[in-house]
């Protein structure tokens, strides 16, 4: 009982000084601090900052109380209480222990406050950048477990329990379990705060991930706020499962983002890509079908480029299209074919008039009417008759007298009209002989009237002149070959005409009149028929062409020989003859 006054004296001045009664009772102080820090309202996620402020105020108040408690043993030691020194040593020891406990509680409160501020800062970053928060989630949870005082300083809590047990046993037996209750209040409070914060963060991030990636909400399996009384192992396992689900969601989202080249916040783009892919495949499948269709306008050369241009533009819109190389080759081949055909026509038209006459005029075409020519069918000789005649007279050169009378009518105009009247009488070599077949020798007369227009500048004082030209054709015989009749080339057609022209020269007479007259006579006289198997002599086509047509061709810059040859080829059509002559000047590229 002697030890109670010093205890009362040491306690009552503390009450009189205005200090809280909790300064002498560390158990009640620990309960107040843990009660101020532990409860966290799950419904209001923004209430963490006021709780952190409350924890700071509680830690400051406890620090002040601990300092005053350190001064209490000094105030309690008086000269009258020297006998109570052994009993006062116990409060001094308890005060030092309470100071250590206060320091540990202050450090833990500061760490919890820093953790709460870190959660607030992290929550703001989550609101600003969802993707960054999701990437750093596992690291953040690992950091929380690393700096938490429960994991770092487990010895401090044990020291607190060991130091508080003697004092509680001394005062009363009822609060003997107070240190264990303090530890039970403190440790579940910290775990409750940690798990509630983790649950809220997991729920928020799980909902956002479900909205972004369309995955099931990982927060459904998390621990709700009302189940703080569950065992620690189950709580940690649930938190770890939530973290693993978040990590799996993040890894799948990052993999999908790197594969598709899109951000995590654009899931609609990832959905639209496979939606558009079938249509693109259909387009790619329809392009070769369009390319297989023949291009329109490939026949017409002016419209070819337009058709190819339209085809190229449509294929570029569709996407990957083949270049129009095949169509270009087809167009080139069609153009080349057309040019070859034109070249063949030009080659045929560029042949000399005599060669054209050889091809067209044969012995089989004697019955065809050429202008005003009339041929008697009885004048045809058979090949057997001619062979018989040649065998009877092998060494006799047969000469057929042919009288050609040429009458030239000169008008007053520069264009002179010359009318040639030729009376040719052909008589067979053996007129009075009879052959084995008994066919009589026939005589025929071919009357040809030809009208030829010659461009000249003769005056009106020139008179009509008549030229007599004797032509002696030769019959060429061959051994074992078919006999053929040819007309000998005229040696000098206008010898007499030139002699008369020099006696009476005209002042405006052109110097090329001789050539013009010679060219006019050559197409009808200078004809050599090739060997043929036909029967009978070759009848030359007449030159009964209008003077206007010949004049038109001559004015185009062509010679009379070319004009007559072209008219012979086309059958007297002046337009077609002029077109043939003009086509000769076209150069075909090779």
From Swiss-Prot:
Tissue expression, as annotated, is:
Highly expressed in renal outer medulla, renal inner medulla, duodenum, ileum and jejunum. Moderately expressed in renal outer cortex, renal papilla, brain and liver.
Residue ranges of the TM segments? none
The Polar residues compositionally biased stretches are 16-35, 150-161, 362-376, 451-465
Where do Basic and acidic residues bias regions lie? 162-179, 188-203, 380-395, 404-420
Tell me which residues make up the UBA domain: 544-584
Q: Where is the composition biased (Low complexity)?
A: 78-91, 313-331
According to the UniProt record, where is the region Disordered? 1-116, 144-234, 277-331, 359-466
Location comes to: Cell membrane; Nucleus; Golgi apparatus, trans-Golgi network
Alphabetical keyword list: Cell membrane, Golgi apparatus, Membrane, Nucleus, Transcription, Transcription regulation
Q: What GO cellular component term, any one, is given?
A: Golgi apparatus
Self-association and partners: Interacts with YRDC.
The function of this protein is: Mediates transcriptional and post-transcriptional regulation of SLC5A1. Inhibits a dynamin and PKC-dependent exocytotic pathway of SLC5A1. Also involved in transcriptional regulation of SLC22A2. Exhibits glucose-dependent, short-term inhibition of SLC5A1 and SLC22A2 by inhibiting the release of vesicles from the trans-Golgi network.
Q: Which named protein is this?
A: Regulatory solute carrier protein family 1 member 1
Q: Which organism is it from?
A: Oryctolagus cuniculus (Rabbit)
Name of encoding gene: RSC1A1
């Amino acid at each position: 009982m002697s030890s109670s006054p010093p205890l009362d004296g040491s306690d009552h001045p503390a009450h009189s000084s205005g200090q809280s009664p909790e300064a002498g009772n560390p158990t009640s102080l620990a309960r107040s601090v843990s009660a101020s820090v532990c409860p966290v309202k799950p419904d209001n996620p923004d209430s963490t900052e006021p709780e952190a402020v409350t924890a700071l105020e509680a830690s400051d108040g406890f620090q002040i109380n601990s300092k005053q408690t350190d001064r209490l043993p000094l105030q309690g030691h008086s000269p009258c209480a020297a006998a109570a020194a052994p009993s006062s040593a116990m409060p001094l020891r308890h005060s030092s222990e309470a100071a250590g406990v206060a320091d540990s509680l202050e450090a833990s409160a500061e760490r919890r406050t820093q953790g709460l501020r870190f959660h607030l800062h992290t929550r703001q970053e989550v609101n600003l950048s969802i993707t960054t928060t999701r990437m750093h989630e596992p690291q953040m949870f690992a950091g929380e477990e690393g700096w938490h005082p429960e994991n770092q300083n487990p010895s401090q809590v044990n020291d607190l329990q060991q130091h508080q047990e003697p004092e509680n046993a001394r005062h009363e037996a009822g609060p003997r379990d107070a240190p264990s209750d303090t530890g039970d209040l403190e440790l579940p409070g910290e775990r409750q705060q940690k798990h509630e914060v983790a649950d809220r963060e997991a729920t928020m991030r799980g909902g956002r991930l479900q909205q972004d990636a369309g995955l099931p909400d990982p927060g459904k399996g998390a621990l709700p706020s009302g189940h703080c009384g569950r065992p620690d192992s189950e709580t940690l396992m649930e938190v770890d499962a939530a973290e693993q689900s978040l990590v799996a969601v993040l890894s799948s989202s990052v993999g999908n983002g790197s594969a598709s080249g899109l951000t995590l916040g654009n899931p609609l783009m990832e959905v639209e890509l496979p939606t558009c892919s079938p249509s693109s495949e259909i387009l790619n499948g329809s392009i070769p079908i369009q390319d297989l269709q023949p291009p329109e306008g490939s026949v017409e050369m002016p419209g070819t480029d337009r058709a190819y241009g339209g085809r190229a533009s449509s294929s570029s819109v569709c996407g990957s299209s083949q270049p129009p190389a095949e169509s270009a080759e087809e167009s080139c081949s069609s153009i080349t074919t057309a040019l070859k055909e034109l070249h063949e026509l030009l080659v045929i038209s560029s042949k000399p008039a005599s060669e054209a006459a050889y091809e067209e005029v044969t012995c089989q075409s004697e019955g065809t009417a050429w202008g005003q020519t009339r041929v008697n069918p009885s004048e045809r000789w058979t090949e057997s008759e001619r062979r018989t005649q040649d065998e009877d007279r092998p060494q006799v050169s047969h000469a057929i007298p042919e009288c050609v009378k040429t009458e030239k009518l000169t008008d007053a105009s520069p264009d002179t009209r010359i009318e040639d009247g030729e009376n040719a009488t052909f008589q067979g070599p053996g007129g009075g002989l009879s052959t084995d077949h008994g066919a009589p020798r026939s005589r025929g007369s071919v009357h040809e009237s030809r009208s030829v227009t010659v461009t000249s500048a003769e005056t009106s004082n020139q008179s009509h002149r008549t030229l007599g030209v004797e032509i002696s054709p030769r019959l060429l015989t061959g051994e074992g070959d078919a006999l053929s009749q040819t007309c000998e080339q005229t040696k000098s057609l206008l010898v007499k005409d030139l002699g008369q022209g020099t006696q009476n020269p005209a002042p405006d007479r052109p110097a090329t009149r001789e050539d013009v007259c010679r060219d006019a006579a050559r197409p009808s006289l200078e004809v050599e028929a090739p060997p043929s198997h036909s029967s009978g002599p070759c009848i030359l086509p007449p030159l009964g062409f209008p003077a206007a047509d010949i004049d038109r061709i001559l004015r185009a810059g062509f010679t009379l020989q070319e004009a007559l040859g072209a008219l012979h080829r086309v059958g007297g059509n002046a337009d077609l003859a002029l077109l043939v002559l003009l086509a000769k000047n076209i150069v075909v590229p090779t």
